[in-house]
Amino acid sequence: MSKQTFTTTFAGNPLVVEVGQVAKQANGATVVRYGESTVLTAAVMSKKMATGDFFPLQVNYEEKMYAAGKFPGGFMKREGRPSTDATLTARLIDRPIRPMFAEGFRNEVQVTNTVLSYDENASAPMAAMFGSSLALSISDIPFNGPIAGVQVGYIDGEFIINPDKEQMEASLLELTVAGSKEAINMVESGAKELSEDIMLEALLKGHQAIQELIAFQEQIVAVVGKEKAEVELLQVDADLQADIVAKYNAQLQKAVQVEEKKAREAATEAVKEMVKAEYEERYAEDENLATIMRDVAEILEQMEHAEVRRLITEDKIRPDGRKIDEIRPLDAVVDFLPKVHGSGLFTRGQTQALSILTLAPMGETQIIDGLAPEYKKRFLHHYNFPQYSVGETGRYGAAGRREIGHGALGERALEQVLPSLEEFPYAIRLVAEVLESNGSSSQASICAGTLALMAGGVPIKAPVAGIAMGLISDGTNYTVLTDIQGLEDHFGDMDFKVAGTREGITALQMDIKIAGITPQILEEALAQAKKARFEILDVIEATIAEPRPELAPTAPKIDTIKIDVDKIKVVIGKGGETIDKIIAETGVKIDIDDEGNVSIYSSDQAAINRTKEIIAGLVREAKVGEVYHAKVVRIEKFGAFVNLFDKTDALVHISEIAWTRTTNVSDVLEVGEDVDVKVIKIDEKGRVDASMKALIPRPPKPEKKEEKHD
């Protein structure tokens, strides 16, 4: 295929798509130019079905530092593992694409997005999402798209599609919404306590804007799209399925209805193992035993899936016996740990999260150096999910994509209520340790984080709580579930997480397994989530109603002073010599910003006070008319140099020592002598003149003797 170019304009930026020039060995490839951001997307598919029991889709988003005209950091000067932002963007693209493949599709699919040039006012992630959908759509990969995504901002009551950097900084909303022509299938958002009505309108505005991008993709597919490949879908043997269902469906149904998680898992596993043992023995000599046993496992999964959904939609019974809109039992505890700066333990049923607060000087902020201009990140929320939380063994290592994503969601939810830097000049880190999990652990971490912040004395604007909503839909009828547990998440159609305060929503995240959901479902889910959020806030506020007035004794205390900008170099000294000396003497930590704000951190108030004295002395300036108790440091023929304070000396001219004539300075003064002086002049170069005699009453002039005349 020769190069073909397609052009349109979207949200104020040119959108140019090039096909047929690069990456021609991939199943599908595009170059998307949005503004001055350029993203190459290549999609490939394996020739055979993978052996696993899931769809092996991998989406990558690669940030090449040359795209922003930067050298990579580190010794190797080469891009390493993906940044957190790159990982989150890859997840953002994966989530709306994944539901658009057929049930039973098991071929491995890999979509790679490489940012080749970067324009901070034209979203590279949105260009990558567009390119991912288009590369799949024009390829022979059986993708049931297209999909597209946009960012939505909210400024002065107006919604803005794909806001630029300046607009996003002023926006009360940072929403990414994606979907197909028919419906929304992915949401990711942070918001400054916006109402459910505004959030719903933002979602609908975003979906409306998506239509233009989907229509553009359809035009391109009509010109360059390939015929879709015929691939084998995972299908079980119908006779085998009928046999297993007839024999064991009643037993599995009974096991699924056991209310307690571990007991239910044991009951269902016992039925499954019994079935597997029977069929493994029956077909032991069959050469297709592996395929048969794969089908047996899949059939049992489908039976459990069907029973969970039937219970909810027909009997209105949930696996643990709750009502459709009922929250599991709640418990909130503060001060779970000694010594730390704050801690909160939040439990919802069999999901439990422990959040630990750490406060630090602003010098501990994380420096983010990606494609965007370097910036400092003051608030960090980290989420850890050990395997013991679900009673299993597993790998331990660096945080995976899921943990990074859940941490980022909690970060968005909580950062909306943090005090400003001026109100609270600390770097803030929260770590959520999931101790038990049966669904909605990310929302438990938000609730635990609120407890830890308030227990630690961080003056947040309001407590935040989170809840996860679910959905069971057969295409015609649907049921929205409040506070989904693990089984409902696994076999359900939606995981819609909503976090916020009593005033409004601070974060949203939605993933679905079906093609999309309607505005009616969104509205109902948001309304149920609000009711649940208020119930959780009642429990949190009953434990701790407001942030404590003081920090924990172990937290670093802080004091700030303001110095002139031109005095910053005086405090720092050559090569940091002066500030290092102060830190060594007092044991404090010191941060100085470009505006002359000096923050001093220590758990010892006396050390803070001593540091303030030292810095005040360093930046102190002599003033005309002020009196100083000085020390003579040098004597010259023309006068004496005295030290007023720290590194500020003044000259007392010989004529300013006394009202009477001074012949030799050394006859009157000696080095080391303490004297009181008054500053009488400071010249344009900062040189100070002082006087001793100005502090001494001027003696009266001698009276003239009258001449006697004979």
Curated annotation (Swiss-Prot):
At which positions is Mg(2+) bound? Answer: 489, 495
Which prosthetic group or cofactor does it need?
Mg(2+)
Enumerate the residue ranges of region (Disordered): 691-710
Provide the primary localization. Answer: cytoplasm
Q: Where in the cell is it found?
A: Cytoplasm
**What is the disulfide pattern of this chain?**
none
Q: Mind listing the UniProt keywords for this protein, alphabetically?
A: Cytoplasm, Magnesium, Metal-binding, Nucleotidyltransferase, RNA-binding, Transferase
> Which class of enzymes does this protein belong to?
transferase
Q: Which residue windows are coiled coil?
A: none
Which reactions does this protein catalyse?
RNA(n+1) + phosphate = RNA(n) + a ribonucleoside 5'-diphosphate
Q: Which family does it belong to?
A: Belongs to the polyribonucleotide nucleotidyltransferase family.
Matching PANTHER family: POLYRIBONUCLEOTIDE NUCLEOTIDYLTRANSFERASE, POLYRIBONUCLEOTIDE NUCLEOTIDYLTRANSFERASE 1, MITOCHONDRIAL
Q: What is this protein called?
A: Polyribonucleotide nucleotidyltransferase
Per the UniProt record, the source organism is: Streptococcus pyogenes serotype M6 (strain ATCC BAA-946 / MGAS10394)
Q: Source organism lineage?
A: Bacteria, Bacillati, Bacillota, Bacilli, Lactobacillales
